[in-house]
Amino acid sequence: MLKISIYLIIVNISALIYAENDQYVLLVSMDGFRADYLETTDTPNFDKLANNGVRSEGLKPVFISKTFPNHYSIATGMYVENHGLIANSFFATDLDKYYTMRDRETVENGNFYGGEPIWVTAERQGVKTASYFWVGTEAAIAGVHPSIWKRYDQKVPFDDRIDSVMAWFSLPMSHRPRLVMLYFHEPDWTGHKYGPSSAKTVDQIQRMDGIMGTIMDKAGKLSIADKLNMLIVSDHGMTEVHSNQIIDLSVYTDLSRVKTTGAGPTVFLSAESTKTLTTVYNDLQQLPNAQVYWKRDIPDRWHYRNHERIPEV
């Protein structure tokens, strides 16, 4: 009996030492933060972070360069054709359902999300995770949620999000997440509305630098500050688009014959009849400054062909 008691004490002490040496990760995404934004205006807090850590030249997003596919690729390490979240909005032929980022029911349906995101892997290993608005965390993927997660609400002030994250890192060890994922919709929202080179976007970049400063200051006061690793990422960049660059597909073909999904630089076309789709495909060969592909001909380098949800054109 004495030997068993001593063994249990040793195990408990070892577990405590291991837990106290655990590292923590805060993964922060600032949507649409183009790599060269850091050169367009003063960003002292980002500069400080880079000077005391490691900075990459930029991120090469997966195709398509949209928010939902790229955030989920960051979380899974998979290309879009592998995880199946093929766009912000799409029709999932395997589920016979539409997915759209503004539809609460679909966003929280784990069947849309393939692969295994990092929080699922961690939770299965007994590592607690938390998310403030990261794509996919609102769904039970393979039956697993982060230990702590939030339903998306863009109106939640950035400071409130930061305070919640710091509170999570201050929880008792038994409830404290070791991986926290935090999402901000800026400067993407401002860039889309006013353009990436606008004065308002520059102002927003400066604001996000201030947000970064707040995160660093508050994180530095945590009891786990010396064990906290911060990663700052973005999902894609942005470029100027002018009205004379907009292409109206209906000028070139009768869109009533096909089902269209997607928007912006990428549009998907499908139809019940292959003959109809072939006619539309041939019509669209006239498009200026655009390329039309059959699914089978999509370039290998885009890793955007081998999933049943990707439409034929």
Map each language-model feature to its residues.
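His/Asp/Glu-rich, glycine-adjacent segments
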Residues: 77-195, 288-289
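Active-site neighborhoods of enzymes that stabilize oxyanions during catalysis
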Residues: 261-313
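Short, structured active-site-proximal loop/turn typified by the sulfatase FGly-forming signature C/S-X-P-X-R
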Residues: 36-83
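Structural recognition of the beta-strand scaffold that forms the well-ordered cores
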Residues: 25-29, 36, 57-60, 73-75, ...
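Loop/turn elements at helix/coil->beta-strand transitions in domains of secreted/extracellular proteins
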Residues: 21-26, 52-56, 82, 124-130, ...
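Metal-dependent active-site segment of extracytoplasmic phospho-/sulfohydrolases and closely related
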Residues: 27, 45, 207-249
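A long, amphipathic alpha-helix that forms part
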Residues: 158-170, 187-228
